[in-house]
Amino acid sequence: MTDGAAKPQADGKQPLLARMLSWLGASSTSAQTPAPGASPVARARRSEADAAPVIAPLDRMTVAQWLWGDGFIMPGDANYVLELVKPFGLSPAMSMLDLSAGLGGPARVIAQAFGTYVTGLERSVERAKRGMEISVAQNLSKRAAIGHYNPETVELRPNGFDCILGRGATYSVVEKERLLRVLFQGLKQRGQLLLNEFTVDPAHAERPELAAWIARETYPPVLWTINQYSDCLTSLGFETRVVEDVTAQYRSMIVTAWERMLTEVDIKAMARNHKMTIIDEAERWMHRLAALQCGALRVFRVYALANKPAR
């Protein structure tokens, strides 16, 4: 299923970032007229001319959890994750690998719901450390262990996992084929792989919205088309069962989460530097939304089986 490109917003509302700046009073408190063409963040910063006390910075991971839930740092709450992994048919006898563990929220939710042993791997050292600390505090250090890894060099124990989940786990990996081969080797015979992944639509690859999003990412994206993923998985021995465009759902989750946070969190009462952290985060997500909206960036769900000979 496809959405097409460059559609106007269906709800007719003004852009989310513009509404956020309005909430913060950016347009009415400016002490200095912003230069023409200044970015929304620059305009907001100019508007905060009054002096503010020095307050410890607001952690980006705190903002992420306001958006997505405790222990969650990307679109998709606990209910979404549990629905996503339904095809796995998880049980206490099974083992699962999460390649985008973040702070470990998804791994812990899955472990608690199904009794499955989940290994969570996270590219950020700090997030992995904090995620494991939370698992320990919740007595889930064994069933939802979180550790750091480098996806460019990771190795897995052969035939070690029944299922592997990756949400945005490969789009910034340079050696994608190598990583997918490692995943194939790490799965048991008829083991299951589920990817929710960013891809590029070659017809819109030169769009400036895509370039702007790429420039803001922590790990530079090296995007494949969905056909490249399909061809690579087949060549490695995977049997692909589902390829579904879930871009519209992903966009909707982003907008809904920001709408909710603007309602539930008293941003106006925050210190200036905390407001700026939220606006910076909003601008990052607006770049992602723009790349999705113009059709250059797509999100696909891919479900495949490791078609290995029986041992």
Report residues per predicted region.
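Conserved alpha-helix/loop element of class I SAM-dependent methyltransferases that forms part
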Residues: 74-92
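Conserved Class I S-adenosyl-L-methionine
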Residues: 242-311
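Short, glycine-/aromatic-enriched active-site segment of Class I SAM-dependent methyltransferases
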Residues: 198-220
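N-terminal auxiliary segments of SAM/dcSAM-dependent transferases
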Residues: 2-52
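A short acidic, Gly/Pro-enriched loop at the edge of an enzyme's catalytic core
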Residues: 155-164
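A short glycine-rich, Lys/Arg-flanked "PGG" loop and its adjoining helix->strand segment in the class I
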Residues: 177-192
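Class I SAM-dependent methyltransferase SAM/SAH-binding core
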Residues: 97, 106-153
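Conserved class I S-adenosyl-L-methionine
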Residues: 93-102
